[in-house]
Amino acid sequence: KDGSVFLGEITNREGIPNPGHPDHLQKQRILLRIGNRDLYGFDFKWVGEDEIAKREQPKDAYFVERREYGALIGVPVAVKEGDLTLAADSAAARQALPGLIEKAEADRHAVETIEKHEIGDINYRIEKARLEARRLDLVARNEPGRDLSRERAALETTTAEQQALFQAKTVELSTLMEKAGTSFVSFRTAEGGSKELRSLDIYRAYPANELGWFGRLGVYSGRLWEFVSGNPRESNTEGGIFPAIFGTVMMVILMSIVVVPLGVLAALYLREYAKQGALVRTVRIAVNNLAGVPSIVFGVFGLGFFVYFVGGGIDRLFFPEALPTPTFGTGGILWASLTLALLTVPVVIVASEEALAAVPRSMREASLAMGATKFQTILRVVLPAAAPGILTGLILAMARGAGEVAPLMLTGVVKLAPELPLDGFFPFAHLDRKFMHLGFHIYDVGFQSPNVEAAKPMVYTTTIFLLIIVVLLNLTAIIVRNKLREKYKTGAF
């Protein structure tokens, strides 16, 4: 009613209580996502329904997902390729926009391939050559009489080749960026202003008011695939969560590889070998009490022992050429996995002890009567029969480990990891690298984001996906457990 015009989508609706009668609503208001944060300074606005004079659903309005500043909502009015105008009105611009976005996606993929893979690989080799040269300097200092000229010459040749390749790829990238950055789309905003976007910055654009059921399904399918397989952007509030998914799954797998042997060996000793007495009872009580220790305490222990003590020692022994830059002496996925293994090992110990105790005495005696040693009996009879119960402990450990965040904040998780812990360079699994985690991603996006309203969908969707991953990991272990249970089925189970 004041003459303001807004173009956006309704994301929420709530009532405003009457100050005199709190139980009665005075009026209703709606939350509009108007986008265009670079123009307005905000992209969400509350509007009272009694203040609205007229509502329309313009068919030519587009919702544009772009590289930065959130969504842009407007009407395409022109398309330019350098100095050439390809479309000078709204109808022509709408017709040219899909092809332009498709071309921009191909150009963006080519740019990312050169930046992240080709130039990234070259930088990796140059850095390895630099560290090797540094190592040779240390060797020459410790062994003055040793001839290292051949190794130095080979390194200089390798570095020169990689530097030349780097320069060539940089020129290729600049040429591609210059060529791809000449296409622009002009949009008219609700108040009549104009905003020009480079086509390379547009990820998705669609006429929201013209979409039918299949059109909406196509948009949601594209967003879902981008969410699962893409990298985050715009302070993690948009894009995908693939690095967080990968980091979470890899951390849980590493944790499981460590926690199962530790837990089973401890349970075997307590149940099969240790003399039952006051000391063993005390140890069992201590193990049970470990499950109640706050997780942040384990994080502090992991930081002090694994990261600083063990990791620092590894750096001094095996990576002196990289110092003072730490390799293992800083947070990484290995230390995070070991910390969570310590956190969850009491669960595996208790479950494994119960499973070992449930194996019938008759099975042990029959094995011993056949001439088997105690070790053979445990290995061939007791452990297979107790495997379903041990896997139950693993399931509980994975469920707890996948959702922990506090210890990871101290031992290796980061807001954005430029590299995955697994790649094509030897030794392929780089356990010293930092990683992203779905739990920390939820915390970061939900509570550290500069745009809370825009981050809400990412928070809820990531939470659901974390639950799905935990369920899938647990289902896998449950299927294996059930198969083992059927194989070694006895009256004790």
Model-derived regions, located:
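Transmembrane alpha-helices
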Residues: 349-353, 359-360, 374-412
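Membrane-topology segments of multi-pass transport proteins
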Residues: 1-236, 492-493
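Membrane-interfacial helix termini and adjacent extracytoplasmic/periplasmic loops
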Residues: 220-239, 274, 298-342, 412-414, ...
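Interhelical loop and adjacent transmembrane-helix boundary motif
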Residues: 235, 411-464
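Alpha-helical membrane-interface segments at transmembrane helix boundaries
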Residues: 229, 233, 238-250, 254, ...
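Membrane-embedded alpha-helices of multi-pass transport/permease systems
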Residues: 261-266, 297-300, 335, 342-363, ...
